[in-house]
């Protein structure tokens, strides 16, 4: 039964939030992995002994996709055939917040990781600075995860259809 508060299209927004969370976060993780991986490959030609040590940017980029996966699973757990428009919009906002924050974080991790591993091959003291900058880039994705989790907890508060 469709009402003004619970139209038939309301679950669509929840599904789009679920999709946005995993798709955008995965795009960011893929870009970060690819960009940092190219830097590691180029650096590995001259300094193959540093390859394992410099895989940290690739690992950090992969963590961004996990943020999107967590929110996607949480949103999909709350999806129902009859859903309020409020819940659908909240779920869309949660998915977009973690997805777009993950996209930005993945771009930052990829660019910093690429330049960082290339620089570390020339000057090993740059490694600590690279790690610090990568942590700040990773936190951007974590902010999106926190906002998405807070939004998702509000999606089912006192909502009736």
Curated annotation (Swiss-Prot):
Keyword Ion transport assigned: yes
Gene Ontology MF annotations: ATP hydrolysis activity; proton-transporting ATPase activity, rotational mechanism
Database matches in CDD domains: ATP-synt_Vo_c_ATP6C_rpt1, ATP-synt_Vo_c_ATP6C_rpt2
Record-linked Pfam families: ATP-synt_C
UniProt xrefs under InterPro entries: ATPase_proteolipid_c-like_dom, ATPase_proteolipid_csu, ATPase_proteolipid_su_C_euk, F/V-ATP_Csub_sf
Keyword check for Ion transport: yes
Compartment annotation: Vacuole membrane
Record site: Essential for proton translocation: 138
Segments on the Lumenal face: 1-9, 76-91, 152-161
Gene3D superfamilies linked: lithium bound rotor ring of v- atpase
Disulfide bonding pattern of the chain: none
Domain of life: Eukaryota
Any Gene Ontology biological process: proton transmembrane transport
Record function comment: Proton-conducting pore forming subunit of the V0 complex of vacuolar(H+)-ATPase (V-ATPase), a multisubunit enzyme composed of a peripheral complex (V1) that hydrolyzes ATP and a membrane integral complex (V0) that translocates protons. V-ATPase is responsible for acidifying and maintaining the pH of intracellular compartments.
Membership in a protein family: Belongs to the V-ATPase proteolipid subunit family.
UniProt name for this protein: V-type proton ATPase subunit c
Name of the gene encoding the protein in the UniProt record: vma3
């Amino acid at each position: 039964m469709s009402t003004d508060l619970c139209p038939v299209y309301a679950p669509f927004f929840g599904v789009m939030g679920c999709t946005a969370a995993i798709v955008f976060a995965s795009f960011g993780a893929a870009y970060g992995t690819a960009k940092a991986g190219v830097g590691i490959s180029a650096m590995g030609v001259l300094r193959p002994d540093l390859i394992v040590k410099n895989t940290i940017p690739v690992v950090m980029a992969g963590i961004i996709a996990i943020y999107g996966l967590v929110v996607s699973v949480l949103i999909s757990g709350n999806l129902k055939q009859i859903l309020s428009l409020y819940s659908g919009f909240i779920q869309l906002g949660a998915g977009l917040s973690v997805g777009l924050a993950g996209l930005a974080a993945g771009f930052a991790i990829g660019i910093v990781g690429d330049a960082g591993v290339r620089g570390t091959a020339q000057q090993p003291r740059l490694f600590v600075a690279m790690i610090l900058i990568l942590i700040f880039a990773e936190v951007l994705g974590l902010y999106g995860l926190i906002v998405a989790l807070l939004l998702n907890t509000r999606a089912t508060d006192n909502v009736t259809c």
